[in-house]
Amino acid sequence: MRLLWKFLAVVLVVSFFANGQESAGKVSKFDDAEYLHLTGADKKTATPIRGTLGFNNETKIVEFVDKKNVPAFSIKYDAIKSILYERTSTPRYVAALLVSPFFLFSHSKKHYLTIQYTDDAGTGQFVSIHLDKKNARDVVATAEAATGKKVEREEEK
């Protein structure tokens, strides 16, 4: 009986350390994100690209991969200057007109993550990602932990 307990203790300790090593080199991926790709000569219109936002702790890169597994951007942690999280709130006018005027009292909330960085040429760039409301807090926490940069928060009420 003691041999069984010793065996279980060894298995538990080995599995604990094995799990710790796996999580340290793991890629944190967040589905249902939209990269707002700036298009046009004036760079004022954005085309949303649906995909997955990932923080790779092994290569120290933030990357966005679209639904076809084509990388949209890749940013090194060292190149990141600042990270901004925004939560916007807008009234639901269409639902108020079509369904009930009480929808004016409820607001739709959208979550955005903006990363400012310098590219290889040394010029300042930025990317904006529309986050899913289900994992927005996790993305902000992961961005802060992975990059070591403080995430600025701007929230409308």
What are these regions (language model features)?
Residues M1-L3:
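N-terminal secretory signal peptides that target proteins for export/translocation
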Residues K6-S15:
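Bacterial N-terminal signal peptides
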Residues N19-T59:
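Anionic N-terminal interaction surfaces
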Residues Q21-S28, A79-K157:
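Acidic, Ser/Thr- and proline-rich intrinsically disordered linker/docking segments
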Residues E34-L36, K60-F64, L113-Y117:
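Short polybasic amphipathic segments
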Residues D42-K43, D66-K68, Y117-A121:
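Short acidic, glycine-rich loop/turn motifs
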Residues G54, S74-K76, S128-H130:
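Generic structural detector for well-ordered beta-strands
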Residues E58-S89:
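Mid-length scaffold segments of soluble, non-membrane domains
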